[in-house]
């Protein structure tokens, strides 16, 4: 996928610079070296400013927390981890200059990009540097194509789209579905294509399909009216929270109360986008490998540590990044301390990581598969689908108390 044309590849190499995690520029070892005597340098790239900054900051924070924990526990083979993260502003071209800074700094292992577009650029550039990539959240299928030293911890889009259709069918949520997707975005279009193929195979009907582009993402009135008129009970919305917040704001009060809006990992952070009225996100279902309210001890410890450090609840972007750093640790240990891209890639298919997003093993294509669940948002609270949220439980209790008081007065 990445070797389409030499000029494109060179453009990617320039855009790839956004893979770093800090602002230091320091000359050091090249990506294929085993690092300095005392440190292993990790670099990552993502949007720390702009409309997608919530994703980049989550990834940065999740990675920082893992680095801190690993270093406090003695590091990796006696070496400390050092992390640098660079701002891509969500732009693939900007992402490339950052990768160059990281290489000058002496990056040994790359955590890739955050958004799919910048990730593809980073992965292409790293191919020429013997750089091992443990991609955090770039999910488009093509993101890691053409680079046999690139692996990822996140869901990939065709898996997500297929799993989304299966989830709706298996949980009896819909036989007829409406779809709204962004036709000029690889992430959204990839999810849409995989979802439709699996939905049709499982006997579901795509009753209505609507599209939008980056240029039309401010006015969803036509799409809302058309989807409402279709009478569907589920609308599949495979796009990012930034655009979803606009759509849901304009859709509020138009659909019946029992209609669900089902999305994938790009919806994470939706509550922050509708903080002026969190009920805008009511009935949003988001597929995820991570639930912050999980009772799993590993997840609970991660959530509490993240809250204590950043005064916020981690989302799956933070969780994926946290797991990515631990995956790097496992790979370096399996490779007897080497950070060579070839050495790390050679051991990756034999590595198993018990992470906060699930148990992960990797195939030769660099992909991992993890169990998927869904979070339901209601009254500003997200809970695993099928469980009552704390907000609903409190509301139900209050209603019961009020009803009891009314009966007593009567």
Summary of predicted features, one role per range:
Residues 35-36, 40-64, 86-92, 115, ...:
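Extracytoplasmic "Venus flytrap"
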Residues 193-287:
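Extracellular/periplasmic bilobed ligand-binding domains
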Residues 251-322, 382, 388:
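Extracellular/periplasmic periplasmic-binding protein-like sensory domains
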Residues 150-211, 234:
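An alpha-beta-alpha
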Residues 102-114, 133-136, 178-181, 231-241, ...:
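Periplasmic-binding protein-like
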Residues 309-318, 329-381:
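Segments of small-molecule ligand-sensing domains
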Residues 26-33, 54-61, 73-144, 212-218, ...:
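Beta-alpha junction/loop-to-helix N-cap segments that form part of ligand/metal-binding clefts
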Residues 1-41, 72, 389-410:
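Short, low-complexity disordered leader/linker segments with a strong preference
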């Amino acid at each position: 996928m990445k070797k389409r044309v030499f000029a494109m590849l060179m453009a990617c190499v320039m855009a790839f610079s956004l893979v770093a995690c800090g602002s230091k520029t320091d000359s050091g070892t090249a990506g294929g070296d085993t690092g300095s005597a005392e440190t292993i340098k990790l670099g990552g790239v993502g949007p720390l400013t702009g409309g997608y900054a919530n994703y980049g900051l989550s990834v940065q924070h999740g990675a920082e927390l893992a680095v801190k924990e690993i270093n406090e526990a003695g590091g990796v083979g006696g070496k400390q981890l050092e992390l640098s993260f660079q701002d891509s502003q969500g732009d693939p071209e900007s992402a490339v200059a950052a990768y160059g800074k990281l290489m000058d700094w002496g990056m040994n292992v790359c955590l890739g990009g955050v958004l799919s577009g910048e990730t593809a650029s980073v992965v292409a550039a790293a191919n020429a540097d013997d750089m091992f990539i443990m991609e955090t959240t770039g999910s488009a299928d093509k993101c890691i194509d053409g680079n046999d030293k690139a692996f990822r911890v996140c869901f990939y889009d065709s898996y997500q789209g297929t799993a989304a259709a299966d989830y709706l069918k298996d949980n009896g949520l819909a036989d007829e579905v409406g779809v709204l997707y962004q036709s000029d975005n690889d992430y959204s279009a990839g999810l849409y294509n995989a979802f439709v193929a699996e939905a049709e195979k499982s006997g579901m009907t795509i009753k209505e399909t609507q599209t939008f582009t980056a240029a039309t993402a401010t006015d969803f009135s036509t799409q809302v009216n058309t989807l409402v008129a279709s009478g569907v009970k589920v609308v599949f919305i495979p796009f990012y929270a930034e655009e979803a917040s606009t759509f849901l704001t304009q859709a509020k009060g138009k659909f019946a109360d029992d209609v669900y809006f089902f999305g994938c990992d790009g919806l994470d952070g939706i509550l922050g986008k509708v903080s002026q009225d969190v009920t805008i996100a009511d009935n949003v279902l988001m597929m995820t490998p991570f639930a912050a309210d999980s009772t799993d001890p590993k997840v609970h410890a991660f959530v509490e540590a993240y809250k204590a450090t950043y005064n916020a609840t981690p989302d799956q972007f933070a969780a994926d990044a946290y797991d990515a750093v631990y995956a790097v640790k496992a790979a370096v240990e399996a490779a007897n301390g080497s950070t060579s891209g070839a050495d790390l890639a050679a051991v990756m298919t034999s590595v198993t990581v018990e992470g906060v997003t699930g148990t992960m093993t990797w195939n030769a294509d660099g992909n991992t598969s993890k169990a998927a669940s869904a979070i339901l948002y209601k009254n500003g609270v997200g809970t695993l689908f099928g469980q009552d949220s704390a907000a609903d439980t409190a509301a139900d209790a209050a209603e019961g108390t009020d009803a009891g008081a009314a009966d007593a007065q009567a």
